[in-house]
C-alpha cells in the first residue's frame, strides 16, 4: 500500500480499530507528495467503462454514484490528473453540489473479469462543458456523446491503492464474453462440418 494512501486513510480511529481487532496497527507514515500514476494504473484506468465515485455533503453524508461510458471515457490527462465527461442524467446533481462545497472524492474502479480493483483519492473540479469546448471534444470524442455532455470533471490524484481481489465476483461484458466464446464457436462449427461430411 503506498505511503500517501495510508497517510490519508489510516486516521487515529482507523489505527485504533486495527489494534482492537488485530492486536496491532499499521504504520501511518508521512503524507509527503501526492502519488503519481504509473504505466500500470494509466493502462488500467484507460480501459474502464465504469466506476463508483464518492463525495461528501456539507452535512457530512457520503454519497456514492455510478459513472459510466464507453471504454476509455475515464481519461488520464497526466500522471496526476484524471478527467471524464459528465453526461446528462437524472438532474439531481448531488455529486456536483457536494463538490461545490468540498472537492474530495474517492473512486472505486473495478475490472470484474480480471478481479482487479484500484482505489483513488483526489480533489475534483467541475467545469462547464460549454466553456471548455476543446477539452469536451477530447473527453467525448463522438458527435453522439458530445450532445450528452453537460459538465467536465477533473480529478487531481492525491493517492491510490491497488486492493486485493477477495470477494470480487468475476463478471464479463458482452464484448469480453464474445472474445472468450468465439474460439469455441469456431471449433464447434469445424466439428459440425466434419460430422456433416462424414454422414
Regions found by a protein language model. Give the residues of each.
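Binding-site signature for planar aromatic cofactors or substrates
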Residues: 1-199
Amino acid at each position: 500500500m503506498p505511503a500517501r494512501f495510508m497517510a490519508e486513510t489510516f486516521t487515529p480511529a482507523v489505527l485504533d480499530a486495527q489494534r482492537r481487532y488485530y492486536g496491532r496497527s499499521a504504520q501511518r507514515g508521512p503524507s509527503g507528495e501526492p502519488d503519481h500514476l504509473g504505466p500500470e494504473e494509466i493502462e488500467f484506468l484507460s480501459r474502464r467503462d465504469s466506476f463508483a465515485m464518492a463525495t461528501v455533503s456539507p452535512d457530512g453524508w457520503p454519497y456514492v454514484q455510478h459513472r459510466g461510458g464507453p471504454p476509455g471515457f475515464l481519461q488520464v490527462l497526466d500522471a496526476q490528473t484524471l478527467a471524464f465527461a459528465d453526461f446528462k442524467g437524472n438532474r439531481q446533481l448531488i455529486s456536483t453540489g457536494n463538490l461545490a462545497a468540498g472537492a474530495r472524492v474517492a473512486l472505486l474502479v473495478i475490472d470484474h473479469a480480471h478481479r482487479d480493483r484500484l482505489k483513488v483519492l483526489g480533489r475534483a473540479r467541475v467545469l462547464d462543458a460549454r466553456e471548455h469546448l476543446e477539452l469536451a471534444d477530447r473527453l467525448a470524442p463522438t458527435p453522439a456523446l458530445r450532445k450528452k455532455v453537460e459538465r467536465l470533471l477533473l480529478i487531481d490524484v492525491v493517492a491510490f491503492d491497488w486492493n486485493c481481489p477477495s470477494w470480487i465476483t468475476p463478471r464479463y461484458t458482452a464484448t469480453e464474453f464474445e472474445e472468450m466464446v468465439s474460439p469455441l464457436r469456431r471449433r464447434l462449427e469445424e466439428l459440425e462440418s466434419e460430422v456433416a461430411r462424414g454422414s
